[in-house]
């Protein structure tokens, strides 16, 4: 697993090891011990999945304390250009954004 820090604190791009063969592939997308060692909170309590048709634009998501939650975003079919905007007042990167291509092909995940 490779973890790349972005210019926005708390946002990482994760590339898991993917083992491909004639049958398909296998990838470990989450391992609490490995995530914790990489500085990623390892106490996920909810797992969601959504399907977006081609051309769909999903809006910005934001949670205020005490309802904040981390997100681990991955794509299982197709691709998305995942954009994260820092709207945290007082953050040194307030107003800046970072983006990553997440796809079934590259198997990258975004931890927000």
Task: Describe each model-derived feature in a short phrase.
Residues 110-112:
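Short tryptophan-centered beta-strand motifs in secreted/extracellular beta-sheet-rich domains
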């Amino acid at each position: 697993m490779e973890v790349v820090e972005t210019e926005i604190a708390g946002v990482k791009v994760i590339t898991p090891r993917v083992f491909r063969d004639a049958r398909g592939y296998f990838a470990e997308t989450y391992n609490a011990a490995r995530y914790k060692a990489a500085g990623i909170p390892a106490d996920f309590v909810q797992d969601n999945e959504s399907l977006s048709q081609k051309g769909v634009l999903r809006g910005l998501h934001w949670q205020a304390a005490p309802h904040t939650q981390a997100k681990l975003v991955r794509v299982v079919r197709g691709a998305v250009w995942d954009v994260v905007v820092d709207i945290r007042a007082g953050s040194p990167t307030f107003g800046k954004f970072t983006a990553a291509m997440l796809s079934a092909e590259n198997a990258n995940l975004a931890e927000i």
